From Swiss-Prot:
Any GO BP annotation: regulation of DNA-templated transcription
Protein family membership: Belongs to the RpoE family.
Xref: InterPro entries: Asxl_HARE-HTH, RNAP_delta_N_dom_sf, RpoE
UniProt entry keywords in alphabetical sequence: DNA-directed RNA polymerase, Nucleotidyltransferase, Transcription, Transferase
SUBUNIT field: RNAP is composed of a core of 2 alpha, a beta and a beta' subunits. The core is associated with a delta subunit and one of several sigma factors.
Free-text function comment from the UniProt entry: Participates in both the initiation and recycling phases of transcription. In the presence of the delta subunit, RNAP displays an increased specificity of transcription, a decreased affinity for nucleic acids, and an increased efficiency of RNA synthesis because of enhanced recycling.
PROSITE patterns to which the protein is assigned, alphabetical: HTH_HARE
The protein's name: Probable DNA-directed RNA polymerase subunit delta
HTH HARE-type domain location: 14-81
GO cellular component, as recorded: DNA-directed RNA polymerase complex
GO molecular function, one term: DNA-directed RNA polymerase activity
Region listing for Disordered, in residue ranges: 89-122, 141-178
HAMAP family in alphabetical order: RNApol_bact_RpoE (MF_00357)
Source organism (scientific name): Listeria monocytogenes serotype 4b (strain F2365)
């Protein structure tokens, strides 16, 4: 089909993909994407704002459509120009890292480290380090200090505080409660 013979009204009904395919067939060579967009804009007589609105969808359609191929560096061509064996598309394969096997052999260094370990439960070693053993009998807590710091917990503590506020007789009933 020759799109050059179409009227402007018929051209406006064409999709950008159809026009891009026509332009690439006529040129018979690859084209940079911005140049392709300019030629489509000129062919369809679109304004800059109109082409900008449709540009994202057009680029997506070109990637999805099986007739076009991206050759890198934003250069596009028709897939029909290239035999299947000649297409060198980048195929990304996921490589999973190989798991390292745990070594079953024991190193001599491990045994040396175990021999050098210090047992801190041994009283002789504690004395060598200059530390003193402290027993609970040596440290007595003063019970009087705890009474001052103790506050009732939960809602009982809140209620006790409310009762304390009104014990001096200043409390009068609210007339709205009657």
């Amino acid at each position: 089909m020759d799109l050059k013979n179409l009227t402007q009204e018929e051209r406006s009904e064409l999709s950008l993909i159809d026009v891009a395919h026509f332009i690439l067939e006529q040129r018979k060579e690859t084209i940079l994407f911005p140049e392709l967009v300019k030629e489509i804009q000129a062919f369809l007589g679109l304004k800059d704002a109109e082409i900008r609105e449709r540009l994202v969808q057009f680029y997506t359609d070109m990637n999805i459509d099986g007739n076009f191929i991206s050759l890198g560096n934003n250069t596009w061509g028709l897939r029909a120009w290239y035999p299947m064996d000649a297409i060198d598309e980048e195929v990304q394969t996921q490589t999973t890292p190989k798991k390292k096997r745990k070594s079953d052999d024991d190193d001599d260094e491990d045994e040396e480290i175990l021999d050098d370990d210090v047992d801190y439960d041994d009283e002789e070693i504690v004395e060598e380090l200059g530390e003193e053993e402290i027993s609970l009998a040596d440290v007595l807590l003063d019970e009087d200090e705890d009474d001052d710091d103790h506050l009732p917990d939960g809602i009982e503590g809140d209620l006790a505080t409310v009762e304390d506020d009104y014990t001096d007789g200043d409390y009068t009933e609210d007339p709205e409660d009657k």
